[in-house]
């Protein structure tokens, strides 16, 4: 066994690797992604034989789905050999890593030609000559010469034809996955070029499809429903979560060809739902920029590829037989310039320099950190790392003076903004949808793994008391617990901060949930806990619950029990006096419950407040208001709304809500385990507030949902780290329930945030149409009030605690006062969190600040300065004061009992 040697002292590769053709030497790191590092390398025995070495750490593939994606890629690449597909030379596995020895493409990927052309013409000797021989149609946009377009179209078609013969669909065709190898290496003329199986123009860089992490075997008649691909190049049927077949690749080909011609994708939007709406609204009418001179035959082909309905879209056989795809390109081949091109190609090979090394600065885009081999490094799903490099949503969040200045400066460069938007959108897709897949996959794995008969106990600073979680378990659940060997009476431990009160002194949340509203129907707690508990956790009648039990898999009969969620949530919130910051605890079986419960409590109070805002935007139906005992009451917020709607309002629905309702009523699944049942009972109307107030409400709700997503994402990452480091793949029922609760809230927050984004964009469009025509876009935007997450939580926490104190003085509803004080404390603790950029367990959660970029140190400092030290001192004083009130209240309650 020989070592992979490394000439670059900045990195270290010391793992043993035996290859059939000899040992390999890793030279310079050329790409680094979420799960892999890509090195430029060569055969140790022959330095002229260059390879790309993709090192994938097993430790990073904690999710079974990620490991499966890598295994799929390896299996596919082993089976396919084609001149226009990046080849797998060798593959080795060790106990800690995978090594994929792959064909080396020194010219990066297609995005270099599209986005970095001017820099390449100045610095890259070969590409400078190529662009001189095949000049772009315009200096003002990123379109390529017709020779490039047709050559790469034919090479794409050749590779796809081969994939179809193997019943393979790639599912992620995009410029970043189309790598370019140096021409005139291994052949010297057109004849030898075509004899090797290549198509197209022999003296242009050769296009090769890479990254088969999303690919799968899919016969022409089969349908898939996994959300894969990058949104700007994704077929509409995938964007709309519909089943799709191999024709999805043809749509992606159409978008790539359009971008090669025009320099920009055919459709752009800030999220995949907006993108789908734009595509559908276009009604198969593809608009080509006026600066693009494209012949009718090529336009017709692009339009046939970009057909909305897959059934009407051009088929593979028709595509392969198309006149443009089969056009003779020999007239573009430059025999006279062959010696010069051949000499410069050999110079590139001999210099052994990657394309990015020729540029003045390492390109942060179009390929982010990977410089041409991003697709290889990010491959088995481009999942977790995107959380630290991109944003969930684009609506306003916590703003600073710095970020506002950045926004204003960026608005002066529309072209730059469009490129940044494209790249940001591609990353956003990874954040939202792939993280959702990861969260649900992990929750399913934990749920199905079984329970540990020795449950993990909850550590507290005082005595532990095991109390009955639910005295009214159904026979089904009773039997299930017995089969699993765990007593349902050991599922939760309530604790008191001041002595030995009986654990049964407090009524269950099911008994109390309607009385919660007596705290004050207009404040946040009544809405947050009343609405969230009754509408979102419960509300199903006995018959519906029985139907769910009979139709659900065994593990879900208990784990998704709404009564269990009621008790779990309440007791976590009430355990505020045992708050331990997760960062101070070691991640092991002893502390996992404390860590997850602290994070779950923070997520719940933020989520609950987001629900208040959501219910103001989309009011509850009359039935639900009756269930929650909120009829005929009005909010006292500055954004006060009437909860009752005139019957006429129910007849008016806007397009966004119609779409949302259709999804809800069909309980469409957004990734495994993600359903819309929680929101399927919404009423059919929006409130009739002024648009400016509705926009503010949407902004506030989105910011709160995003913060909840950030905490929930961190919780699932902590769970993932613990789960995959654990020797035993089993856990207590308590941990299992916590994981399922985190999954449910993550999916719901994600769904509602997406919905609100669509709503706020519609509101902004309508609002903009009402302002004076001479008002500039910047003036319009500046009218929106900035939203600060910390201020939202701080103000609401004080409001809740003041109302609780007022009721305590009257001696009313002491149980609810206790819950109110605890909720207030959790909110204040959450407002002090600075963990949006770091994570004690080595991974990054979602960012909640839209305008910050993870690599910008100055922005991070500005973010943390939203609360200065004086602000923090004030908040800590309030925490101490409210905690003292809570302690006194509990002593009073214990004395009464």
Curated annotation (Swiss-Prot):
Keywords: ATP-binding, Autophagy, Cytoplasm, Kinase, Membrane, Nucleotide-binding, Phosphoprotein, Protein transport, Serine/threonine-protein kinase, Transferase, Transport. Disulfide bonds: none annotated. The keyword Protease does not apply. ATP binds at residues 30-38, 54. Pfam families: ATG1-like_MIT1, ATG1-like_MIT2, Pkinase. CDD domains: STKc_ATG1_ULK_like. The modification Phosphoserine is found at residues 34, 304, 356, 365, 390, 508, 515, 517, 533, 551-552, 621, 635, 638, 647, 677, 680, 683, 769, 783. The modification Phosphothreonine is found at residues 129, 226, 590. Changing residue 226 to A: Abolishes autophosphorylation. The active site is at residue 172. Belongs to the protein kinase superfamily. Ser/Thr protein kinase family. APG1/unc-51/ULK1 subfamily. Homodimer. Dimerization requires the presence of ATG13. Forms a ternary complex with ATG13 and ATG17. Also interacts with ATG11. This is Serine/threonine-protein kinase ATG1. It comes from Saccharomyces cerevisiae (strain ATCC 204508 / S288c) (Baker's yeast).
């Amino acid at each position: 066994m020989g070592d992979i040697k490394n000439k670059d002292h900045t990195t270290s590769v010391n793992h043993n690797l035996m290859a059939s053709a000899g040992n390999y030497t890793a030279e310079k790191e050329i790409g680094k992604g979420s799960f892999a590092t890509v090195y430029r390398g060569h055969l140790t025995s022959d330095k002229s034989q260059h390879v790309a070495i993709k090192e994938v750490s097993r430790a990073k593939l904690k999710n079974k789905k990620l490991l499966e994606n890598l295994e799929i890629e390896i299996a596919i690449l082993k089976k396919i050999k084609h001149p226009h597909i990046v080849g797998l030379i060798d593959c080795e596995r060790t106990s800690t890593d995978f090594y994929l020895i792959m064909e080396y493409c020194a010219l990066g990927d297609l995005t270099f030609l599209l986005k970095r052309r001017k820099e390449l013409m100045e610095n890259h000797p070969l590409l400078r000559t190529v662009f001189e021989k095949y000049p772009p149609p315009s200096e003002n946009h990123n379109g390529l010469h017709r020779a490039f377009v047709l050559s790469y179209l034919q090479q794409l078609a050749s590779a796809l034809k081969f994939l179809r013969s193997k019943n393979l669909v790639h599912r992620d065709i995009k410029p970043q996955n189309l790598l370019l190898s140096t021409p005139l290496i291994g052949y010297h003329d057109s004849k030898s070029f075509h004899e090797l199986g290549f198509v197209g123009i022999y003296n242009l860089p050769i296009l090769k499809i890479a990254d088969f992490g999303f690919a799968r075997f899919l016969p022409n008649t089969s349908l898939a429903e996994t959300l894969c691909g990058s949104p700007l190049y994704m077929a509409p049927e995938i964007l709309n979560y519909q089943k799709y077949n191999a024709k999805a690749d043809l749509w992606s080909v159409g978008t790539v060809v359009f971008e090669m011609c025009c320099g920009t994708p055919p459709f752009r939007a800030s999220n995949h739902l907006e993108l789908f709406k734009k595509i559908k609204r276009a009604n198969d009418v593809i608009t080509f920029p006026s600066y693009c001179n494209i012949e009718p035959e090529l336009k017709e082909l692009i339009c046939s590829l970009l057909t909305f309905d897959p059934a009407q879209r051009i088929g593979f056989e028709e595509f392969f037989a198309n006149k443009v795809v089969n056009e003779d390109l020999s007239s573009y081949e430059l025999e006279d310039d062959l010696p010069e091109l051949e000499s410069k190609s050999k110079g590139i090979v001999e210099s052994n320099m990657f394309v990015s090394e020729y540029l003045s600065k390492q390109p942060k885009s179009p390929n982010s950190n990977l410089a041409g081999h991003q697709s290889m490094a990010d491959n088995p799903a481009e999942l977790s790392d995107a959380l630290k490099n991109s944003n969930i949503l684009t609506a306003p969040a916590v703003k600073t003076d710095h970020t506002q200045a950045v926004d204003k400066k960026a608005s002066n460069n529309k072209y730059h903004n469009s490129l940044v938007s494209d790249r940001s959108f591609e990353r956003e897709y990874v954040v939202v949808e792939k993280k959702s897949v990861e969260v649900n996959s992990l929750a399913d794995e934990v749920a199905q793994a079984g329970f540990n008969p020795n449950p993990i106990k909850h550590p507290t600073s005082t005595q532990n008391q095991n109390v009955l979680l639910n005295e009214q378990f159904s026979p089904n659940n009773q039997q299930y617990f017995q089969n699993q060997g765990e007593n349902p009476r050991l599922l939760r431990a309530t604790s008191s901060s001041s002595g030995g009160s009986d654990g049964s002194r407090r009524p269950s949340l099911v008994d109390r949930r309607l009385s919660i509203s007596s705290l004050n129907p207009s404040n946040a707690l009544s809405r947050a806990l009343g609405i969230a508990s009754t509408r979102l956790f419960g509300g199903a009648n006995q018959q519906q619950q029985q139907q769910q039990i009979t139709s659900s898999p065994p593990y879900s009969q208990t784990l998704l029990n709404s009564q269990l969620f009621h008790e779990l949530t309440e007791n976590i919130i009430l355990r505020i006096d045992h708050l331990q910051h997760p960062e101070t605890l070691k991640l092991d079986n002893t502390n996992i419950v404390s860590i997850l419960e602290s994070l779950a409590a923070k997520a719940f109070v933020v989520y609950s407040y987001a629900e208040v805002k959501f219910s103001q935007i989309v009011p509850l139906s009359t039935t639900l208001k009756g269930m929650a005992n909120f009829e005929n009451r009005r909010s006292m917020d500055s954004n006060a709304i009437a909860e009752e709607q005139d019957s006429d309002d129910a007849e008016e629905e806007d397009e966004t809500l119609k779409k949302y309702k259709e999804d809800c009523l069909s309980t469409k699944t957004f990734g495994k385990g993600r359903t819309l049942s929680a929101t399927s009972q919404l009423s059919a109307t929006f409130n009739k507030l002024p648009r400016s107030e509705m926009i503010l409400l949407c902004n506030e709700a989105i910011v709160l949902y995003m913060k909840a997503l950030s905490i929930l994402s961190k919780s699932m990452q902590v769970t993932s780290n613990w789960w995959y480091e654990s020797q035993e793949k089993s856990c207590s029922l308590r941990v299992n329930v916590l994981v399922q609760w985190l999954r449910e809230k993550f999916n719901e927050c994600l769904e509602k945030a997406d919905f609100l984004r669509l709503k706020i964009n519609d509101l902004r469009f309508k609002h903009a149409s009402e302002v004076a025509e001479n008002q500039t876009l910047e003036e319009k935007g500046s009218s929106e009030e900035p939203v600060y997450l910390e201020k939202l939580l701080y103000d609401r926490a004080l409001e809740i605690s003041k109302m609780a104190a007022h009721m305590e003085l009257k001696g009313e509803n002491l149980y609810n006062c206790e819950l109110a004080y605890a909720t207030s404390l959790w909110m204040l603790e959450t407002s002090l969190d600075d963990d949006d950029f770091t994570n004690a367990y080595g991974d990054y959660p979602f960012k909640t600040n839209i305008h910050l970029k993870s690599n910008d140190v100055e922005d991070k400092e500005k973010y943390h300065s939203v609360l200065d030290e004086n602000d923090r001192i004030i908040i800590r004083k309030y925490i101490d004061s409210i905690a003292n009130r809570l302690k006194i209240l509990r002593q009073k309650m214990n004395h009464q009992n």
